[in-house]
Regions:
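ATP/Mg2+-dependent ligation/transfer catalytic cores
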Residues: 1-173, 195, 372-429
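Active-site capping/gating regions of soluble enzymes
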Residues: 3-77, 81-109, 193-359, 365-370
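Flexible domain-boundary/linker segments
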Residues: 30-31, 121, 125, 177, ...
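Helix-rich catalytic cores of soluble enzyme domains
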Residues: 124-224, 228-239
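Alpha-helix boundary/capping detector
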Residues: 134, 186, 190-191, 295, ...
Length: 429
């Protein structure tokens, strides 16, 4: 058949929605969707969420893309593209997560700085047992930093690597994580929008390839109760107009070599810690991961080469100087999460927020930090709503939609536990 086009966007639930379109759509073009998908929940409940226009006729929105953004796909005779959403009057849709990230990038570019992002994804591999129940993938020889067939007997990760290479994704690493069968996937630093475009497509590709092996590869934050959690670590830096790394003060990194920009970004991330959680750890399951002593970004703190703090300062300097924010999970929309982190960092710089002292505790038995994220989704959404500086920066309409949908989610999940709670999310994240 003629090559077709798969046109996609990543929605408020971090679900990839799209259409297969004919060969004639390969070029600068567009297609329409129902705007009220922004009021659809995981269980397909239709909700009158702010901006979704569920009770105003369920009007169209338009996905627009450029020819240069079209790329090859991992499926035969198919190309793939991501685009931006517009309302039926042709205006940029305020609910569009990709547009939200572009606005966050533009706010930094007004300062002469260009955000660079590298994202680390973690995921668990599940498979059906003889009764059809999802259980952890059988990899008894898996160990932290494991490679080869002991960690992945079916070798589905080899196929993911090969296809990622063929598709032009710049993989830095695939490895087994601490809790078998958990894996980490890291893509190379790039300009913020390009980096997130790559991560949402890579995540989709990895899940679809794994399904061919009978594996449900889930990026949800805590699918296995007795194991650790899965995060989406956001590494960021900034390129200045001369092409240098604006976070760098020289060849050495770490807390003793931070410049004013790094301190300001850190202060903003600390200041907006509780509000950020509602956007970047956005499910009931997220708060099974966000716990003290779990290396997950719970505490309102920062440190150097320290995995039990929320924002970690790389010991590498020069071109590799960066901040690593460790709170987010991949149940969040990556565009929205990166936008929120960039805005929180920017607000710290602009408002001269005070940076508290570095964390000196080990994070297990002792922690200096006195405050963490909320203990559940309901509390995190309340914290987000209170952080009006953050919600206005990210986008008031997008955040209003998010808050409404997540409060509905609190009610939908409050009586679920164990497999029932996992299965509310697992096939979508």
């Amino acid at each position: 058949m003629k090559t077709r086009l798969r046109a996609l966007y990543c929605d408020h639930l971090s679900i990839m929605r799209g259409k297969y379109l004919p060969h004639s759509k390969i070029g600068d073009d567009s297609t329409r969707f129902c705007r009220s998908t922004f009021g659809v929940h995981y269980d397909r409940d239709l909700l009158d969420a702010p901006g979704a226009m569920m009770k105003q006729g369920l009007p169209d929105m338009e996905l627009k893309w450029q020819h240069d953004d079209i790329r090859d796909s991992w499926h035969a005779s198919t190309q793939i593209v991501l685009g931006d959403l517009y309302d039926d009057a042709g205006e940029k849709l305020s609910l569009c997560p990709r547009g939200t990230l572009k606005r966050a990038v533009a706010a930094w570019e007004e300062k002469g700085l260009h955000p660079k992002v590298g994202i680390e994804l973690e995921a668990f591999a599940l498979q059906a047992d003889d009764n059809g129940r999802l259980v952890p993938y059988d990899a008894p020889g898996g160990v932290v930093y494991g490679t080869g067939p002991a960690a992945d007997p079916l070798r589905f990760n080899d196929r993911i690597w090969a296809m990622a290479d063929e598709m032009g994704f710049s993989l830095d690493m695939i490895t087994a994580e601490f809790d078998s069968p958990q894996f980490e996937y890291t893509l190379t630093f790039d300009n913020a929008v390009k980096a997130v475009d790559d991560i949402v497509l890579f995540r989709l590709m990895a899940r679809e390839i794994a399904l061919e092996y009978g594996i449900v590869l889930t990026f949800m934050p805590k699918p296995v109760a007795e194991a650790g959690g899965s995060g989406m670590h956001i590494n960021l830096s900034f390129t200045d107009e001369a092409g240098g790394n604006a976070l760098s003060s020289g060849p050495r990194g770490g807390p003793d070599h931070m410049n004013d920009l790094a301190r300001g970004c850190l202060a903003g991330l600390i200041h907006h810690h509780k509000g950020l959680a509602g956007l970047i750890a956005p499910t009931a399951n997220s708060y099974m991961r966000l716990q003290p002593g779990s290396l997950s970004g719970y505490w309102q703190n920062w440190g150097g080469d320290h995995r039990n703090v929320t924002t970690r300062i790389s010991s590498e300097g020069g071109a590799k100087a960066r901040l690593e924010h460790r709170m987010a999970d991949a149940a969040s929309n990556p565009y929205t999460s990166v936008a929120a982190v960039l805005h929180a960092a920017r607000l710290g710089v602009e408002h001269n927020h005070v940076l508290p002292p570095i964390e000196t505790g080990d994070g297990f038995d002792r922690t200096d930090a006195k405050h963490g994220t909320a203990i559940n989704l309901a509390g995190a959404i309340d914290d987000l709503e209170r952080d009006t500086a953050l919600t206005e920066a990210v986008g008031s309409e997008l955040c209003a939609n998010h808050i409404y949908m997540k409060r509905k989610e609190v009610r939908k999940t409050r009586d679920l536990e164990g497999d029932a709670l996992r299965d509310f999310y697992v096939h979508f994240i």
